[in-house]
């Protein structure tokens, strides 16, 4: 699907116009020196498979036919080729335009279009056709909606339960800024099997890395959702490393997650989507990722996936099997 093009005279805030790269992040209050750092050479242990082959083409065609999006494509995930080849994907609902401008993320920013009322049905039919045992549903931030999109998440969960009652469901949500209480109320009435919300980074980086987000608010969302659920729910969060944080700061975030009763953790290497995004300050070694996994297990996480290519939904089906 071709990206909308901004033409001369077109309103910059027109609905449906996608801003990426420099146009997306130019208003983010970040130190210019941070963006202009020379790009580091990727080490030998960071290798992604090319997104080619018949299964990859089949998955993309199916997405287009059902008017669905995957975070794999929209966020330029390096694992797209591997996941699509095995018939798995993380479905991104509520469109492909985000109301936030996080400078680490490659999802487009702009004024989103209205929600597609047929999306829950199309999503449920697609995951049924794929024969998935476990599905991951995420979304763009929708700060334009009264409930932040919580009711649309719930509609997708209900429709998948109706069509595929044995399928386990994992949702990766935004922080529902200013609407978290309402979102928790809506989603606790239609719970998934795994509730995931990523902290992404350490608290001192939030103003630059997650503009519009709040570290404590994200922790409270994870805690409050678990408390509100009428059934046992697994909670999960994810971190990316390599933006200049110290190991001790990562360990403190992990402790904060455990103190808010989070069960599962993913830790992966941040990779710069383009020259316009935040640069990688450091590449972590496999040994450092192993260390973080070991420390996480000591803290009491039920499952820790830690590695350079690990992402929130990477092998999420296998991870879920260990705790559900």
Swiss-Prot record:
Protein location: Cytoplasm
Pathway stated in the Swiss-Prot or TrEMBL entry: Protein modification; protein lipoylation via endogenous pathway; protein N(6)-(lipoyl)lysine from octanoyl-[acyl-carrier-protein]: step 2/2
EC numbers: 2.8.1.8
UniProt keyword list: 4Fe-4S, Cytoplasm, Iron, Iron-sulfur, Metal-binding, S-adenosyl-L-methionine, Transferase
Domain of life, per lineage: Bacteria
Binding residue positions for [4Fe-4S] cluster 2: 98, 102, 105
Enzyme class: transferase
Positions of the Radical SAM core domain: 84-302
Requisite cofactors: [4Fe-4S] cluster
GO CC terms of this entry: cytoplasm
Main location: cytoplasm
Regions annotated as coiled coil: none
Ribonucleoprotein recorded as keyword: no
SMART domains reported in the protein's UniProt record: Elp3
Catalytic activities: [[Fe-S] cluster scaffold protein carrying a second [4Fe-4S](2+) cluster] + N(6)-octanoyl-L-lysyl-[protein] + 2 oxidized [2Fe-2S]-[ferredoxin] + 2 S-adenosyl-L-methionine + 4 H(+) = [[Fe-S] cluster scaffold protein] + N(6)-[(R)-dihydrolipoyl]-L-lysyl-[protein] + 4 Fe(3+) + 2 hydrogen sulfide + 2 5'-deoxyadenosine + 2 L-methionine + 2 reduced [2Fe-2S]-[ferredoxin]
UniProt GO MF annotations: 4 iron, 4 sulfur cluster binding; lipoate synthase activity; metal ion binding
A family per Pfam: Radical_SAM
Cofactor details (free text): Binds 2 [4Fe-4S] clusters per subunit. One cluster is coordinated with 3 cysteines and an exchangeable S-adenosyl-L-methionine.
Residues the entry annotates as binding [4Fe-4S] cluster 1: 72, 77, 83, 313
Family from the record: Belongs to the radical SAM superfamily. Lipoyl synthase family.
Name by which UniProt lists this protein: Lipoyl synthase
UniProt organism field: Dichelobacter nodosus (strain VCS1703A)
Highest classification ranks of the organism: Bacteria, Pseudomonadati, Pseudomonadota, Gammaproteobacteria, Cardiobacteriales
The gene coding this protein: lipA
């Amino acid at each position: 699907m071709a990206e909308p093009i901004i033409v001369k005279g077109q309103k910059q805030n027109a609905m449906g116009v996608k801003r990426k790269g420099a146009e997306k992040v130019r208003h983010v209050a970040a130190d210019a020196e941070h963006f202009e750092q020379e790009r580091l050479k990727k080490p030998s242990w960071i290798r992604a498979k090319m997104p080619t082959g018949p299964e990859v083409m089949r998955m993309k065609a199916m997405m287009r036919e059902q008017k669905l999006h995957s975070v794999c494509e929209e966020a330029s995930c390096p694992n797209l080729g591997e996941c699509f080849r095995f018939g798995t994907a993380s479905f991104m609902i509520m469109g492909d335009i985000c109301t936030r401008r996080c400078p680490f993320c490659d999802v487009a920013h702009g004024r989103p279009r209205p929600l597609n009322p047929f999306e829950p049905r199309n999503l449920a039919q697609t995951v049924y056709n794929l024969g998935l045992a476990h599905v991951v549903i995420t979304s763009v931030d929708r700060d334009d909606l009264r409930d932040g999109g919580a009711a649309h998440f719930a509609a997708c969960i209900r429709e998948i339960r109706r069509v595929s009652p044995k399928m386990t469901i994992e949702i990766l949500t935004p922080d529902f800024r200013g609407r978290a209480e309402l979102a928790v109320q809506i989603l606790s009435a239609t719970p998934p099997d795994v509730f995931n919300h990523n902290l992404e980074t350490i608290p001192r980086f939030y103003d630059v890395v997650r503009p519009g987000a709040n570290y404590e608010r994200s922790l409270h969302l994870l805690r409050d959702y678990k408390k509100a659920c009428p059934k046992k729910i697994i909670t999960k969060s994810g971190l990316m490393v390599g933006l200049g944080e110290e190991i001790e700061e990562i360990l403190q975030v992990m402790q904060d997650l455990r103190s808010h009763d989070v069960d599962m953790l993913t830790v992966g290497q941040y990779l710069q989507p383009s020259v316009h995004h935040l640069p990688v300050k450091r590449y972590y070694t496999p040994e450092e990722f192993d260390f973080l996994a070991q420390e996480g297990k000591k803290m009491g996480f039920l499952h820790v996936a830690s590695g350079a290519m690990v992402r929130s939904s990477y092998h999420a089906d296998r991870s879920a099997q260990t705790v559900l």
